[in-house]
Amino acid sequence: MTVFGMLRVTPVTDEDITEEVAAAIEALENHDVTYETNPMSTVIEAETVDDLLAAVGAAHKAVPGDHIETLLQIDDRRDETFAARRKTEKVEEELGREARSDRE
């Protein structure tokens, strides 16, 4: 996989947004992408930028509401192919440990 995206789809509201965020993530299932959600965003991997943008568009459209904000950052690796997890593994190799704290 060569295209990575960091996606954040947020309905603008004072209410809880868990259901809406879940709808955006569920929409990714209909696309040829892999993804991992964290508390701040969802990292998406796709073979092409077109695949990534189609998935992002579906996630955005899946969120109900009158005011939706979507933030997308794209890393388009055209010179080599590797998974996003490899980026984290390289940092962890340099650290000699997992790239996270032991605190809870």
Predicted regions and their residues:
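Charge-rich, low-complexity N-terminal segments
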Residues: 1-104
